[in-house]
């Protein structure tokens, strides 16, 4: 993919493809860090999924990760933003497993709601089977929301090979162990959130496009 196609996608209006750090927000790194710190002091952990409810995005695996954390006694909430062909299947799974109190299918959301989702969540989960330009990973890091993602495309690079987020192995118990290790230690979560903010804020949209294009094109 070249910079032209990346730019065209960046200009599209969908939540998935529109790269927008909402840099008009006047919060600086200090206030972002303080907010990330305050989130770790809460007893409840907020998880976010943003994407189509399709097999390629694996939203069922997202639900199962949070479900297993819940079974292990963690106070967790998951919100999924997006629509897709798997919605009925996910609704059935949530109902059959009595997860209505912790898992919420929110449908498509506007930019303002997505922004608030990043700001209020501890983690973004993205277990995609493929990802051309993982905009949501960088946006999550920008707002101090730690990504949990599959190592596709340039995701491992973006996440510092695990220093700025949790890299999924797509084996449920192993992945839940990884997440549990982060949420059990406040300093580990804060370090990941802080490093993600520092890394993502190096980039303007143009610079980010150029860097990702270089990675994708080798």
Regions found by a protein language model. Give the residues of each.
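Conserved donor-binding/catalytic core segment of Leloir-type glycosyltransferases
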Residues: 31, 41-57, 63-66, 79
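Nucleotide-activated donor-binding/catalytic signature segment of Leloir-type glycosyltransferases, i.e.
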Residues: 91-109
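Short alpha-helical donor nucleotide-sugar binding micro-motif in glycosyltransferases
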Residues: 108-109, 116-121
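Aromatic "clamp/platform" in nucleotide-sugar-dependent glycosyltransferases that forms part
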Residues: 129
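Short hydrophobic beta-strand element within catalytic cores of glycosyltransferases
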Residues: 146-149
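Conserved acidic donor-binding segment of nucleotide-sugar-dependent glycosyltransferases
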Residues: 161-173, 181-186
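A short, well-ordered alpha-helix in the C-terminal region of glycosyltransferases
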Residues: 188-202
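C-terminal alpha-helical cap of glycosyltransferases
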Residues: 205-218
């Amino acid at each position: 993919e070249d910079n032209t196609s990346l730019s065209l996608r960046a200009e599209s209006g969908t939540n998935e493809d529109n790269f927008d750090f909402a840099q008009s927000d006047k919060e600086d790194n200090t206030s972002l860090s303080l907010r990330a710190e305050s989130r770790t002091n809460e007893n409840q952990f907020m998880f976010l999924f943003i994407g189509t409810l399709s097999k390629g995005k694996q939203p069922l695996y997202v639900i199962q990760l949070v479900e297993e954390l819940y079974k292990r006694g963690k106070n967790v909430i998951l919100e999924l933003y997006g629509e897709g062909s798997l919605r009925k299947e996910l609704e059935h799974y949530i109902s059959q497993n009595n997860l209505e109190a912790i898992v919420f299918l929110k449908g498509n959301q506007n930019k303002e709601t997505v922004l608030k989702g990043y700001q209020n969540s501890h983690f973004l989960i993205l277990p995609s089977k493929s990802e051309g330009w993982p905009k949501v990973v960088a946006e999550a890091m920008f707002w101090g929301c730690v990504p949990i993602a599959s190592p596709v495309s340039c995701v491992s690079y973006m996440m510092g090979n695990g220093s700025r987020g949790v890299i999924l192995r797509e084996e449920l118990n192993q992945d839940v162990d990884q997440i549990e290790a982060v949420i059990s230690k406040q300093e580990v979560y804060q370090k990941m959130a802080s490093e993600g903010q520092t890394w993502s804020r190096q980039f303007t949209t143009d610079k980010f496009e150029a860097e990702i294009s270089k990675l994708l094109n080798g």
